[in-house]
């Protein structure tokens, strides 16, 4: 199948609207991607004609809803090439998935004197849960430092591991810098030291194929809303042997086998024992439609198109005076920048006046901001529906802001 950005754009209703009297140029998909009609329609159709509570229902609607939900689990397992659909847990998003691992596996396996390794480029969602776990149990949090070009100082990684290292928690792709970390060698090194590996894939799965078996990671987590799906739904992958050993971290309906006031409670098997309560079934249906949509476009096609667009954007941005770019030349998805000494909020506000949507702030990466000694950055992100013309508008807008503000 040949990739056509025009055909893709026609599937996203919001891209036809105007902002401040100008066509919308949506360059904020790394925060949350827009949704194609196929996703919107699938979720709406479920609520209109197929909604029911899943699991244990004997009536037709419940049985059909349960089947649809479990089919999405199967589709998601194929999407990341898991060995089994039963290695996947539905979560609210990447943040909940990481917290689940920290509170279930972490509480059972990390002890006083142990250590966990993260990096200086992590999103807060892959920092704070580990800080909280370390504080609870008396463990140490170790950090892989950054190079100025936005890559990790990988030569320091072997010195951070020891016999007390229990986990390496690392982002696949930086949400600020676009750096794609060399996971294969990092995971191999971690396993050589007996440590498990969690990968934050929130900024990776929409840009190119991900194969969790080839990576050999122990945990992989991503969100639906950055993958053109609904909010409030995501996937946590855990190797089956690990998942079966992990205790539940939330209690309630659906995650039990038996409940007795005198004899206590026994759990159902994984992954369902990690899905307490009524699930976000509509969101799951929408996620399934998003996975189907992205797969139909072809992730390799998407990767090729987006990389060409990224190369074009980086080359065109060289024409903007006083523009500071952050991150390596080879990157995925995002371009973080500042214009002169102007605050990112001011630059972002001007761009919004021109109909261009970018993200401004610390991007849930305060340690990274501290490393670059800036309070905030602007971030333009590129998705499969963005165009060369939108990149040109961004460049022209920044040039205009520079002329206005100096």
UniProtKB/Swiss-Prot annotation:
The modification N6-(pyridoxal phosphate)lysine is found at residue 226. Its cofactor is pyridoxal 5'-phosphate. InterPro entries: Aminotrans_V_dom, Aminotrans_V_PyrdxlP_BS, Cys_dSase_SufS, PyrdxlP-dep_Trfase, PyrdxlP-dep_Trfase_major, PyrdxlP-dep_Trfase_small. Its main location: cytoplasm. GO terms for cellular component: cytoplasm. One of its GO terms (biological process) is cysteine metabolic process. It is found in: Cytoplasm. Pathway: Cofactor biosynthesis; iron-sulfur cluster biosynthesis. It catalyses: (sulfur carrier)-H + L-cysteine = (sulfur carrier)-SH + L-alanine; L-selenocysteine + AH2 = hydrogenselenide + L-alanine + A + H(+). CDD domains: SufS_like. The active site is at residue 364. Cysteine desulfurases mobilize the sulfur from L-cysteine to yield L-alanine, an essential step in sulfur metabolism for biosynthesis of a variety of sulfur-containing biomolecules. Component of the suf operon, which is activated and required under specific conditions such as oxidative stress and iron limitation. Acts as a potent selenocysteine lyase in vitro, that mobilizes selenium from L-selenocysteine. Selenocysteine lyase activity is however unsure in vivo. This is Cysteine desulfurase. It comes from Escherichia coli O157:H7. The lineage of its organism: Bacteria, Pseudomonadati, Pseudomonadota, Gammaproteobacteria, Enterobacterales.
């Amino acid at each position: 199948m040949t990739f056509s950005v025009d055909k893709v754009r026609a599937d996203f209703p919001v891209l036809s609207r105007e902002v401040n009297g100008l066509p919308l140029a949506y360059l904020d998909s790394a925060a949350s991607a827009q949704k194609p009609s196929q996703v919107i329609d699938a979720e709406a159709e479920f609520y209109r004609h197929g909604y029911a509570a899943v699991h244990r229902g004997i009536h037709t609607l419940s049985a059909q809803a349960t089947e649809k939900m479990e089919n999405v689990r199967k589709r998601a397992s194929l999407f990341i090439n898991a060995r089994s659909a039963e290695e996947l847990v539905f979560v609210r998003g990447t943040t909940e998935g990481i917290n689940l691992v920290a509170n279930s596996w972490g509480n059972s396996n990390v002890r006083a004197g142990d250590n966990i390794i993260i990096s200086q480029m992590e999103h807060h969602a892959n920092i704070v849960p580990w800080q909280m776990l370390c504080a609870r149990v008396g463990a140490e949090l170790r950090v892989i430092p950054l190079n100025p070009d936005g890559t990790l100082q990988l030569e320091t990684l072997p010195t951070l591991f020891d016999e007390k290292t229990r986990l390496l928690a690392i982002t696949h792709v930086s949400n600020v810098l676009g750096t794609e970390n060399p996971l294969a060698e990092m995971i191999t090194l971690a396993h050589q030291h007996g440590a498990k590996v969690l990968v934050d894939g929130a900024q990776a799965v929409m840009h190119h194929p991900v194969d969790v078996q080839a990576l050999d990671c122990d945990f992989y987590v991503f969100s639906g809303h950055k993958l053109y799906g609904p909010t409030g739904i995501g996937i946590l992958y855990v190797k089956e042997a690990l998942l079966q050993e992990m205790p539940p971290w939330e209690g309630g309906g659906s995650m039990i086998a038996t409940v007795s006031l005198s004899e206590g409670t026994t759990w159902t098997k994984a992954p369902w024992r990690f899905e307490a309560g009524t699930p976000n079934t509509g969101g799951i249906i929408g996620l399934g439609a998003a996975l189907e949509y992205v797969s139909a476009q072809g992730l390799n096609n998407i990767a090729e198109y987006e990389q060409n667009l990224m190369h074009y954007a980086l080359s065109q941005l060289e024409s903007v005076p006083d523009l500071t770019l952050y991150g390596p030349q080879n990157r995925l998805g995002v371009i973080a920048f500042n214009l002169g000494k102007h605050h990112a909020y001011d630059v972002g506000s001007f761009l919004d006046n021109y109909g261009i949507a970018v993200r401004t702030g610390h991007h849930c990466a305060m340690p990274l901001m501290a490393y670059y000694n800036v309070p905030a950055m602007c971030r333009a992100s590129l998705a499969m529906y963005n165009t060369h013309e939108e990149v040109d508008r961004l460049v022209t807008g920044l040039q205009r802001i520079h002329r206005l503000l100096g």
